[in-house]
Curated annotation (Swiss-Prot):
Pfam families: Interferon (PF00143). SUPFAM superfamilies: 4-helical cytokines. Keywords: Antiviral defense, Cytokine, Disulfide bond, Glycoprotein, Secreted, Signal. Residues 1-21 form the signal peptide. GO terms for molecular function: cytokine activity; type I interferon receptor binding. Its main location: secreted. Glycans are attached at N131, N173. SMART domains: IFabd. This is Interferon beta-3. It comes from Bos taurus. Has antiviral, antibacterial and anticancer activities.
Length: 186
């Protein structure tokens, strides 16, 4: 008796997971809300004097990021996922010189992780289907961009001014993320 009920339950669970993973409207809502929380948390981090921003470098955000409306949903998912993953990795580095609240950073990391968790099933589906065009080249450009941010932090020995510059870059990234998220429609 138990086995007869088990098969329909497993099938229902598999179907609902697939159906949920492709519900872009729900995903858009969840991602937008979470990105707003991340922006708010980043805004709560103590800033340093204005002179730190004068030392900023031109990190050259990939050109494609200025054309978010041209991304297909699948490409947008790949790009959003990559950006979140890279931001997460940066924020797990040594920020002790900043005086930032560890609680705020932990909350930020939890939000980022939650966003990546929601995106991962769709991201995996897209990668398996190899159903991407613009996203794959943009991801390569993003990796270079984030590599440059990490190199900058390392060259400045993770000092407070370097973190201020990177924090501003990450805040700018969330503007891009919001635009990309807005393009997710069923």
């Amino acid at each position: 008796m138990t086995y007869r009920c088990l098969l329909p339950m497993v099938l229902l669970l598999c179907f609902s997971t697939t159906a949920l993973s492709r519900s872009y409207s729900l995903l858009r809502f969840q991602q937008r809300r979470s990105a707003e929380v991340c922006q708010k948390l980043l805004g709560q981090l103590h800033s340093t004097p204005q002179h730190c921003l004068e030392a900023k470098m031109d990190f050259q955000v990939p050109e494609e990021m200025n054309q978010a409306q041209q991304f297909r949903k699948e490409d947008a998912i790949l790009v959003i996922y990559e950006m979140l993953q890279q931001i997460f990795n940066i924020l797990t580095r040594d920020f002790s010189s900043t005086g930032w609240s560890e609680t705020i950073i932990e909350d930020l990391l939890v939000e980022l992780y939650g966003q990546m968790n929601r995106l991962q099933p769709i991201q995996k589906e897209i990668m398996q289907e190899q159903n991407f065009t613009m996203g794959d080249t943009t991801v390569l450009h993003l990796k270079k961009y984030y590599f440059n941010l990490v190199q900058y932090l390392e060259s400045k020995e993770y000092n407070r001014c370097a973190w201020t510059v990177v924090r501003v870059q990450i805040l700018t990234n969330f503007s891009f993320l919001m635009r990309l998220t807005a393009s997710l429609r069923d």
